[in-house]
Amino acid sequence: MLVKILDACCGSKMFYFDKTNPNVTFMDIRRYSDILCDGRKLEIKPDIIGDFRNMQFSNDEFDLVVFDPPHLIKAGKNSWLAKKYGLLDFASWQDDLSRGFNECMRVLKPCGTLIFK
């Protein structure tokens, strides 16, 4: 049985052992690559560029949705935390998370599973 999974804020796909799993649609608002100060490569390479607050998927499309949105509202412009995890807008973060949660529930099938991390 094919299980359709959406990672709505995949970032560098740290959540996954198999970063090429064909069952997972990796989505993020950005595509980004950088070398961190300790020499590690940071690569954000989603399948789909998209905004978790306004997803372009049909209702009830996924069996499992992973929602691990950015959780920082303050960070320096060159902060590795901001580069790795992204930033929420200081003025709208509560509304952004609420809209994202609602979108995740919309694209999740009835009786599906939401992982809110």
Provide a role label for each language-model segment.
Residues 1-117:
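Class I S-adenosyl-L-methionine-dependent methyltransferase catalytic core
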